[in-house]
Amino acid sequence: MTKIVFYRSQGIFYGFEEIGHVGFGEWGEDPFCAMLSSITMYIVDAIEEVYGARVDYRIDEEKARITVRSKAALPEFEEDDRVRFAVSGLFLTYYTMLEDMLLHDDMYEFTKDSGFRVTVEDRDYE
C-alpha cells in the first residue's frame, strides 16, 4: 500500500510525500509504482528545468519514501504568478488524477494490502 500525503497551504498545493509500494506487482515490476515514480520525476524535472524554480525532494529507498516540495507554488515565496500557478498546478493535477483513479478503483485488481491512499494536510511550508 502506498500512502500519498499532499501538502496544502491556504488552499494551494505545494508538495507531497509518497510512502510504501503499491503492491500491484512484484517489487521492480509493479506498473503502478512505475507510474507514480514517473509522474513524481516529471514534476521534479518540470519545476527545475521548465519553470526554473527550486524544488526540494528526498528519496529514501530503504523506507520507500519520496518527498517533493516547492516554495515556488506559494505567493509568499514566488513573485512570478506564471511560475507559481504552473508549479502549484502540477501538484493539483497529480492530486486530481489520483483521486479520479480512486473513484474507478473497480478497474484495478488490488488486494486488501495493495493500492494507494491519498490524503491532504493543510499546513504551512516548513
Where in this protein do the model-derived segments appear?
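N-terminal intrinsically disordered, cationic/polar leader segments
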Residues: 1-30, 45-126
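Alpha-helical support elements that line or immediately flank enzyme active sites
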Residues: 35-38, 42-47
